[in-house]
A protein has these predicted regions:
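Thiamine diphosphate
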Residues: 1, 65-66, 70-276
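Short coil/turn segments at secondary-structure boundaries
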Residues: 12-13, 59-60, 218-219
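Short secondary-structure junctions and interdomain/linker hinges
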Residues: 4, 8, 21-36, 53, ...
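Active-site diphosphate/adenylate-binding microenvironment
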Residues: 16-94, 98
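Short, isolated positions within intrinsically disordered regulatory regions of eukaryotic proteins
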Residues: 8, 14-17, 25, 75, ...
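Glycine-rich, acidic loop regions that bind phosphate or pyrophosphate groups
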Residues: 1-16, 208
Length: 276
């Protein structure tokens, strides 16, 4: 395959598509949303603050998908993101491991508040062992990725936000008094609270200059989505429901399935008498 190349027409299509997507990325990075920034703008600020040898780490929630779509990797070892099992809690521990593997690189860990709550204990390990990492703690007061997924199949975001129960017994009361910045400080990390993108950019500069693990805490608006990839995730929808939203989601799901192409099929595919 050494000398094999696609034809020029197809290569030009690829270049055009790549340029168009790059324009979408730039627009997502430039979003100036208030009062809370979009997650894509936070990612863009980190990309602008990193150099070619820095490493980013991520794992669960909406961050891996957004990083996969938006982040422009500049080094083969500069991008360490776990996708397959969406392992909540992997991020900080993985960042510690990456830094141990190559102490010469600055490591930026992207983690949402849901994953942070699952496992943050390696912060104290990083302090104990004098292994500095930078943790970008993106707070949206809940499990927003799975919340959005549940909405996409026609059901509400049940139990996916950090709320008190209301008088009706539902998890729709006031926000819980969660202060993950204080928690990170209690584990020995330097903590910088950023209230907007300008403060966030300054915090990234300070975090790089610090000599111990630093957590940069910023809230974002979970309703501002990154550009759509155009791909489709086969997540089945309940076939029987009293909810209008679920029935409508089922129609969309069944329509989307018609576009599936099966490249690998058993030899008895479509045989009604087959036991499989």
């Amino acid at each position: 395959l050494k000398d094999w190349r696609v034809d020029e027409e197809y290569a030009e299509q690829c270049r055009t598509a790549a340029a168009a997507w790059n324009d979408s990325v730039e627009a997502a990075y430039a979003l100036d949303h208030h009062p809370l920034p979009a997650q894509s703008a936070i990612i863009g600020a980190v990309e602008a603050a990193t150099n070619d040898r820095d490493v980013i780490v991520g794992a669960a929630g909406s961050l891996p998908g957004d990083l996969h779509k938006l982040w422009r990797t500049r080094d083969p070892k500069g991008y360490h993101v776990e996708y397959a099992f969406s392992c909540m809690g992997y991020e900080i521990a993985a960042g510690l491991g990456v830094k141990m593997a190559d102490p010469s690189r600055e490591v930026f860990v992207f983690v949402g508040d849901g994953s942070y709550l699952m496992m943050n204990s390696e912060i104290i390990t990083s302090i104990q062992e004098d292994i500095k990492i930078i943790v970008i703690l993106v707070v949206n007061h809940g499990f927003q990725s799975i919340g959005a997924l549940s909405e996409s199949v026609g059901v509400e975001r049940f139990g996916t936000t950090y709320r008190y129960r209301d008088q009706a017994g539902q998890l729709a009361g006031d926000k819980l008094p969660l202060d993950l910045a204080a928690n990170a400080a209690s584990l020995g990390a330097q903590v910088i609270r950023a209230n907007n993108l300008e403060e966030f950019r300054a915090a990234l500069v300070q975090a790089r200059a610090n000599t111990i693990t630093t957590v940069v805490h910023i809230e974002d608006d979970p309703t501002i989505a990154a550009p759509d990839s155009g791909s489709w995730w086969d997540v089945p929808v309940a076939e029987v429901s009293t909810r209008t939203s679920t029935r409508e989601a089922l129609v969309r799901y069944e329509e989307a399935r018609t576009a599936q192409r099966h490249f690998l099929r058993p030899t008895n595919w479509g045989d009604p008498d087959s036991p499989s």
